[in-house]
Amino acid sequence: MAAPEPLSPAGGAGEEAPEEDEDEAEAEDPERPNAGAGGGRSGGGGSSVSGGGGGGGAGAGGCGGPGGALTRRAVTLRVLLKDALLEPGAGVLSIYYLGKKFLGDLQPDGRIMWQETGQTFNSPSAWATHCKKLVNPAKKSGCGWASVKYKGQKLDKYKATWLRLHQLHTPATAADESPASEGEEEELLMEEEEEDVLAGVSAEDKSRRPLGKSPSEPAHPEATTPGKRVDSKIRVPVRYCMLGSRDLARNPHTLVEVTSFAAINKFQPFNVAVSSNVLFLLDFHSHLTRSEVVGYLGGRWDVNSQMLTVLRAFPCRSRLGDAETAAAIEEEIYQSLFLRGLSLVGWYHSHPHSPALPSLQDIDAQMDYQLRLQGSSNGFQPCLALLCSPYYSGNPGPESKISPFWVMPPPEMLLVEFYKGSPDLVRLQEPWSQEHTYLDKLKISLASRTPKDQSLCHVLEQVCGVLKQGS
């Protein structure tokens, strides 16, 4: 057995992938002269270790008369209603986010009324941001057009349809603009996975799907024409703390430096042993193509010794765009895992011509996979990611660089931060009874459970300090 380097946490987006923060004015109308959307803003950030944010919106030009440039940011719900692509109705809009469902009414003027509270919102992004912040207070933007569904279909599709219908009347520069919102691809993937959870798909069933990339995802930018030597642009890794907020200028393929557990004064949460056969097959697979490769890792998790043993690699022998072949390969791998008595313990992929460091997109995916493998139980189930860089010019020699990484859960998962701003948050200063507030009750209840080696006053001071910071 060959043990890899100690695992390193990497910056990531937690539960959310990069997304767009759209700020649409209620009065926008592409048929009005000189109407246009505002410029971009940065999206949400995350923790200094692993948080990761969303992207900001793109600037948009005006779209007035016949010579005006048509842009996707000029499309609003009111425009889609006016052109009969949408119809107003009760409960026709929905958001699924981290196991929560929100329903909204589409009003004739293009506004959204949230059924639960009766609040109205001027745009999908405003509603999505509000709802997502209730579930995850650290959320900075809502990616409304990718998050909100109209009668089961994402609003992005209706926006794209509207743009296609109007491209015949626009200049070539406008026709070249992508109808899909930039930076939303990861958000779309994440929301599809959330829907699988809502539909009752178990972690075991989900293991049949590739952990690396969606089969329909286009080839990685590193893919090149066969027979040509690669002179790809060097992707310079950045430290997570230097990222700041993630806007549209931040490429999801931006590489992020990993940090050792020792550097952040934390113990490695589990030990890892990897079979040399796994490293051999991963290295071999990565050398065969100039494009990224993806595969599964099978092994066992020993709860008592906190040891994750990776015993076999299962390459996905399909192209990223070949969904039909991918489904058959996934089923074959699933059966192989089952027959060998192995569990799905992780995934691997390659960066052919870049350092063996995770990208923002990789980090987003890894965090989601960690949560998915853990499932609904409280038991800890690790998920390991391996990265191979076979042709990176910065490698010390001909030998490929193989690196493991694991994403440290972001601090917004702390309990106080998690519930902060939620509608069902207990207001500790309010009276619980005639004699006590909710805070008094909490102190009395915790007093009987204070650790023996710590003083009661010290523990309660710490608890109260945390509560004050979260209020």
From Swiss-Prot:
Positions contributing to DNA binding: S123, S125, W145
Domain RAMA: 71-166
UniProt short sequence motif JAMM motif, positions renumbered to this chain: 349-362
Subunit structure: Monomer. Mainly monomoric, but when binds to dsDNA, forms homotetramer assembled into two homodimers. May interact with histones; this interaction is facilitated by dsDNA binding.
GO biological process terms, semicolon-separated: double-strand break repair; proteolysis
MF-aspect GO terms: metal ion binding; metal-dependent deubiquitinase activity; metallopeptidase activity; polyubiquitin modification-dependent protein binding
The keyword Phosphoprotein is annotated on this UniProt entry: yes
PTM info: Degraded following binding to N(6)-methyladenosine methylated DNA (m6A).
UniProt remark on domains: The RAMA domain recognizes and binds N(6)-methyladenosine methylation on DNA (m6A). The RAMA domain mediates interaction with histones. The two acidic regions inhibit DNA binding. The two acidic regions promotes histone interaction.
Gly residues bias spans: 36-63
Ranges annotated as biased composition (Acidic residues): 16-29, 182-197
Family that this chain belongs to: Belongs to the peptidase M67 family.
E.C. code: 3.4.-.-
Modified residues (N-acetylalanine): A2
Domain MPN: 272-407
Modified residues (Phosphoserine): S8, S178, S181
UniProt-recorded name of the protein: MPN domain-containing protein
Positions with biased composition (Low complexity): 1-10
Binding site for Zn(2+): H349, H351, D362
Top-rank taxon, per record: Eukaryota
Region spans: Disordered: 1-63, 170-229
Role according to the record: Probable protease. Acts as a sensor of N(6)-methyladenosine methylation on DNA (m6A): recognizes and binds m6A DNA, leading to its degradation. Binds only double strand DNA (dsDNA) in a sequence-independent manner.
Keyword Metal-binding attached: yes
GO CC list: BRCA1-A complex; BRISC complex
Keywords: Acetylation, Hydrolase, Metal-binding, Metalloprotease, Phosphoprotein, Protease, Zinc
PROSITE patterns for the chain: MPN
